[in-house]
Amino acid sequence: YVEVSEASIDWTAPEVLQGLIEDMAKQYALATDNAAADALLAGTSQTTGNVDPADPADWIAKVYACAITILSNGNYLPDHLFVSSDVFAQLGQLSDSSDRPLFPQVGPMNAFGSMNPGSRESTVFGLRLVVDTNFAAKTTIVGAASTGAFRVYETQKGSISIDNPSTLSRTVAFRGYFAPKMIDANQFMLIPQA
């Protein structure tokens, strides 16, 4: 919560209150995203062997190992690849034996996907890429996310305020209910790095 003086509310243009509420909404979003990332990582109990982050063939082997395990556990194929920002950079730097990007951004032919550093619409190994800075370093999770095996329940209540006549101020807060839950851990696998 934040306490704002009546004078600050009355004498600012644009109104300081709107900026504070927007900032609190962003902080709420970051906190809930962090909770979801932590819950997904903590709830993912299956792992492959360590991947060599610079070896494209090892990445392919590990992703397919995850796919076959997820398929065997529930008859689903994975559809998402969740990674930390450092793994995002590792994947973007992978190249084939001719030094061509493994995931080119323009005109990919026979590529395993397409990605670029400025887009959230990336496909890696045929999986939708989700990059989150709230994951711990070296996080890579392959998952069948569209199955609902990991869910997030949220009611965003928004801002609330109360006037404080004794201090000629207003206390403002931003709140909501948020509960991430791993429903079926068999639909997710972690690819660790040494």
Give, region by region, the residue ranges found by the protein language model.
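Alpha-helical scaffold segments that mediate packing/assembly in large oligomeric complexes
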Residues: 1-73, 190-194
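Short loop/turn segments at secondary-structure transitions that flank enzyme active sites
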Residues: 8, 30, 34, 87-89, ...
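Short helix/loop capping segments that flank catalytic or ligand/cofactor-binding pockets
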Residues: 12-13, 90-92, 181-183
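Extended oligomerization regions of viral-like shell subunits
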Residues: 49-176
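Structural signal for terminal/edge beta-strands and the immediately following C-terminal loop/tail
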Residues: 176-194
